[in-house]
Amino acid sequence: MNGRVDYLVSEEEINLTRGPSGLGFNIVGGTDQQYVSNDSGIYVSRIKEDGAAARDGRLQEGDKILSVNGQDLKNLLHQDAVDLFRNAGYAVSLRVQHRLPVQNGPIVHRGDGEPSGVPVAVVLLPVFALTLVAVWAFVRYRKQL
C-alpha cells in the first residue's frame, strides 16, 4: 500500500434559500489563505446546525465551492469570497465539487443499470489462470507416462 488516498470527484448544483442565520455554513480558502496546498479554492469548513445548508443536506464539510450564482470563485481573496456570499441574495445557486474517498471492496448494488458487484474480469481472470496451470500440469504429467 502506498499510503495515497484516491478520490472520486463529482460536481453538483445546490440551490439554497438564505435563512435567518444566512446560508448556514462557513468557508475557508482563497488566494491569501490556501486551505489545500497549491489550491486557492474556497472550501466548506463547517455546516451550521439547523442552517439552510444543514436542512438541505447535500453540502458537506470539505466540499469545494466552484461558483456562486454563476460567478466563478477562482483566484479570489478570502474576504472577496465572503463578500460574494453575503451579497448573493435570498436564493443562492452553488456549483459544488464533492470529493468522495474510493473504498476498497465489492461494488454495492444501487439500482437498475448500475454496477451490482465484482466486475466479471476480476472473477474470470483467476479462473482462466488456474485453467492454464491445470492444462499445463496435465500435459506435463501425460508426457511422463
UniProtKB/Swiss-Prot annotation:
UniProt tissue specificity: Widely expressed.
PROSITE patterns to which the protein is assigned, alphabetical: PDZ (PS50106)
Mitochondrial intermembrane topological domain: 139-145
GO biological process terms held by the UniProt record: intracellular distribution of mitochondria; negative regulation of angiogenesis; negative regulation of endothelial cell migration; negative regulation of endothelial cell proliferation; negative regulation of ERK1 and ERK2 cascade; negative regulation of sprouting angiogenesis; positive regulation of activin receptor signaling pathway; protein targeting
Main location: mitochondrion
Topological domain ranges for the Cytoplasmic compartment: 1-117
CDD domains reported for this sequence: PDZ_SYNJ2BP-like (cd06709)
SMART domains to which the protein is assigned, alphabetical: PDZ (SM00228)
Location of the protein in the cell: Mitochondrion outer membrane
Keyword Zinc on entry: no
GO cellular component: cell surface; mitochondrial outer membrane; mitochondrion
Regions crossing the membrane: 118-138
One Pfam entry name: PDZ
Molecular-function GO term, any one: type II activin receptor binding
Alphabetical keyword list: Membrane, Mitochondrion, Mitochondrion outer membrane, Transmembrane, Transmembrane helix
Residues annotated as domain PDZ: 13-100
Subunit-level organization: Binds (via the PDZ domain) to isoform 2A of SYNJ2 (via the unique motif in the C-terminus). Interacts (via C-terminus) with RALBP1. Interacts (via PDZ domain) with ACVR2A (via C-terminus) and ACVR2B (via C-terminus). Forms a ternary complex with ACVR2A and RALBP1. Interacts with MAPK12. Interacts with DLL1; enhances DLL1 protein stability, and promotes notch signaling in endothelial cells.
Functional summary from the UniProt entry: Regulates endocytosis of activin type 2 receptor kinases through the Ral/RALBP1-dependent pathway and may be involved in suppression of activin-induced signal transduction.
Protein name from the UniProt record: Synaptojanin-2-binding protein
Organism of origin: Rattus norvegicus
